[in-house]
Amino acid sequence: QPTIVRFLMENLMKTIEITLGDMEKRISRFRALKPLPIQQDPEIPQEAKDVVYARKLLSVIGLEGDANTPINNSSPITGAAGMTMTLAVCPPGQGPSLHAHQQTYETFTVLRGRFEVTWNDDGGGSVELNEFDTISVPPKVNRAFRNIGDDEGVLQVLITGGVHDMADIDMSPDVAVKLDRIKTGVKQKFAAMGLTFNAHKGAAA
């Protein structure tokens, strides 16, 4: 027993020290964050972007490795044991439409303002969240959120578990209808980056 304890103390419980330069790679500065690249595409009407995303989706932490996702491509920090973090900034009344994550949990914490979170295929489940309230939505459940305050609101969004890629996110079928009404071809823009529009309990497996 003493030998095992000594081994653990000498090998597994050691600390490391890193430089300021190394730690800077683990710091995200809010003022330096920019919306996802597709949110800056001038060919996509703002109305269409608002159907799919928060007005500004700011990537804070991306996955380790070379995962090619919008969050990874713009995050200042990479690698946090499989967790990703974004900040969803929404003007009053705005928020993304119903969508499901097939494998991952999505956890929302209100950092500023008041939000309504809805869930299920018809959005029939509903709860209001105030500052610092948190809700964690499990995989395969349709969910949406909307700023119900009078000022700009901010949600912290954590994605954990499962595989974090575009195949994990599936929009509700009515999102495709909304996009087609806004502008011909805009749905295909989102589909080209991997979004699908089949999130419904009646969808084919």
Question: Which residues does each predicted region cover?
Answer:
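Short acidic-glycine-tyrosine-enriched beta hairpin
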Residues: 121-138
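Histidine-centered metal-chelating micro-motifs
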Residues: 95-97, 116, 133-135, 139-145
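Short histidine-centered beta-strand/loop micro-motifs
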Residues: 73-79, 96-102, 119, 126-128, ...
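Cationic, low-complexity basic patches in intrinsically disordered or flexible, solvent-exposed regions
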Residues: 2
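Double-stranded beta-helix
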Residues: 11-16, 144-205
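A short, N-terminal "cap"/entry segment at the start of jelly-roll beta-barrel domains
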Residues: 6-82, 187-205
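Glycine- and acidic-residue-biased ligand/ion/polar-headgroup-sensing regions
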Residues: 103-116
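Conserved short histidine dyad/triad with adjacent acidic residue
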Residues: 66-73, 86-101
